UniProtKB/Swiss-Prot annotation:
Chain spans, region Switch-II: 67-83
InterPro entries named among the record's database cross-references: P-loop_NTPase (IPR027417), Ran_GTPase (IPR002041), Small_GTP-bd (IPR005225), Small_GTPase (IPR001806)
First and last residue of the signal peptide: none
Organism this protein belongs to: Brugia malayi (Filarial nematode worm)
Superkingdom as given in the UniProt entry: Eukaryota
Protein name per Swiss-Prot or TrEMBL: GTP-binding nuclear protein Ran
Keywords: GTP-binding, Nucleotide-binding, Nucleus, Protein transport, Transport
Protein residues bound to GTP: 17-24, 35-41, 67, 121-124, 149-151
Recorded GO MF terms: GTP binding; GTPase activity
PANTHER family per the UniProt record, alphabetical: GTP-BINDING NUCLEAR PROTEIN RAN, RAN GTPASE
Location of the Small GTPase Ran-type domain: 6-170
CDD domains with a match to the protein in the record: Ran
Function: GTP-binding protein involved in nucleocytoplasmic transport. Required for the import of protein into the nucleus and also for RNA export. Involved in chromatin condensation and control of cell cycle.
């Protein structure tokens, strides 16, 4: 998607099982939602998400599948020329985490060495099934991981900031203003947030299991 301006622009491929909240997540960014384009040949919506950094603007053209993944794998055209990716699962549904290696395999088959963030969505839901200590796939594959909650905007910007730093080669890059986001539909419990952040920090220092079983 060529644009007439000089904003650095990157194709971001958003994948994961159906129902994990990918569309809800991308729609939080209001200007991206307003300016999205539908690509009929591939059946995808492309949301241009602009973020303001201390080095100027950066745009992620986020490709959202519009639910096609419910009918099997995605076509290569979805992945081709992808420059970065987010793999999403639902922390309230173990099977969506169990399928992460399949999404990762499909992704790297087409886009070999791109920066990838793994996101566990719906951490606002009290009945969390996939706990921090069981989320090890990203450590084995050198991906970044974030807990997120699309409906509360919790950690919304984190995956984009990490990817922007990788893509622009600047570990000190910062976002200087938050994009306009849809108002939170739910509130995160601060005690729960503190607990989860502690668990993630502890899990990052734990030894990895020897086998390939990720659950």
């Amino acid at each position: 998607m060529a644009t007439g301006d000089d904003i650095p622009t990157f194709k971001l491929v958003l994948v994961g099982d159906g129902g994990t909240g990918k569309t809800t997540f991308v729609k939080r960014h209001l200007t991206g939602e307003f300016e999205k384009k539908y690509v009929a040949t591939l059946g995808v919506e492309v949301h241009p998400l602009i973020f303001h950094t201390n080095r100027g603007q950066i745009r992620f053209n986020v490709w959202d599948t519009a639910g096609q993944e419910k009918f099997g794998g995605l076509r290569d055209g979805y992945y081709i020329q992808g420059q970065c990716a987010i793999i999403m699962f639902d922390v309230t549904a173990r099977v969506t985490y169990k399928n992460v290696p399949n999404w990762h395999r499909d992704l790297v088959r087409v886009c070999e060495n791109i920066p990838i963030v793994l996101c566990g969505n719906k951490v606002d839901v009290k009945d969390r099934k996939v706990k921090a200590k069981t989320i090890t796939f990203h450590r084995k594959k050198n991906l970044q991981y974030y807990d997120i909650s699309a409906k509360s905007n919790y950690n919304f910007e984190k995956p984009f900031l990490w990817l922007a730093r990788k893509l622009l080669g600047d570990p000190n890059l910062e976002f200087v203003a938050m994009p306009a986001l849809a108002p939170p539909e739910v509130q995160m419990d601060p005690t729960m947030v503190a607990q989860y952040e502690q668990e993630i920090a502890a899990a990052a220092n734990a030894e990895l299991p020897d086998d390939d079983e990720d659950l």
